[in-house]
Amino acid sequence: MTMFVALDFPDWKQTEAFLYKNELQGVPVKVGMELFYKEGPSVIEKLKRNNHSIFLDLKLHDIPNTVHRAMKNIASLGVDLVTIHTLGGSEMIAQAKRGLEHSQTKLIAVTLLTSVDEEVVQHQLRLPGNIPANVAHLASLAKANGADGVVSSVHEVASIKKTCDTSFLTLTPGIRFDSSDVHDQKRVATPEMANQVGSDFIVVGRAITQSDHPYTAYMEAKKRWEEASDE
């Protein structure tokens, strides 16, 4: 069980100020597109020097050979987790895993973004079936082609574990202290909800980064995440 703090900042200066002025050195962190595309691999090196576990959330989605070569470079960074899109297909997923074969980095596949609702699935993407059915299918595709796990809202974790095996990892973003606080993610949850359905990892962003007291918010989220199973 690991809780990642989403470093949704535009540059290293703001990231550094947030982490180290708030006594958050060494906490597991998520680096997304905004920060990585601004700072490049150097941000990973800086975070590793300060003993952070790192979830690199780039959601790669390209032709298989391009993703394979990108993953070989990502493998050299030594991050703990990295994401791709399952909608790139079986060969892309397999080539992504192949690019990581000499590293300890785990491959996590995105099924449907947590910002997507049934309206988008049915009328914009025109995918057959509802969200749970599509997520289960894409999770099975990811597992069959070597992925270590998938990104999943709390609503799909149980079905993924049932379909793919309990050892198949699930990472749940969109964690809030109040499940009605949705912002731009439609399928959100609290730390307790994620624990109770069996999520292996969670990502907490605004609830910590926009708090007046980030360290206190971090400790509260961590406590709620870790202790929910004891209730």
From Swiss-Prot:
CDD domains given in the database record: OMP_decarboxylase_like
Q: Which residues form the active site?
A: 59 (proton donor)
| Pathway membership, UniProt | Pyrimidine metabolism; UMP biosynthesis via de novo pathway; UMP from orotate: step 2/2
Stated EC number for the protein is 4.1.1.23
What does the record list as coiled-coil region(s)? none
Q: What class of enzyme is it?
A: lyase
Q: Which GO terms describe its cellular component?
A: cytosol
**InterPro entries, alphabetized:** Aldolase_TIM (IPR013785), OMPdecase (IPR014732), OMPdecase_AS (IPR018089), OMPdecase_bac (IPR047596), OMPdeCOase_dom (IPR001754), RibuloseP-bd_barrel (IPR011060)
A biological process term (GO) from this entry: 'de novo' pyrimidine nucleobase biosynthetic process
Record field: catalytic activity: orotidine 5'-phosphate + H(+) = UMP + CO2
Q: Which UniProt keywords apply?
A: Decarboxylase, Lyase, Pyrimidine biosynthesis
Gene3D superfamilies the record matches = Aldolase class I
Residues reported to bind substrate: 8, 30, 57-66, 114, 176, 185, 205-206
Task: Give the protein's function.
Answer: Catalyzes the decarboxylation of orotidine 5'-monophosphate (OMP) to uridine 5'-monophosphate (UMP).
Oligomeric form and interacting partners: Homodimer.
UniProt lists the family membership as follows: Belongs to the OMP decarboxylase family. Type 1 subfamily.
> Which named protein is this?
Orotidine 5'-phosphate decarboxylase
Q: Which organism is it from?
A: Oceanobacillus iheyensis (strain DSM 14371 / CIP 107618 / JCM 11309 / KCTC 3954 / HTE831)
Q: Give the encoding gene's name.
A: pyrF
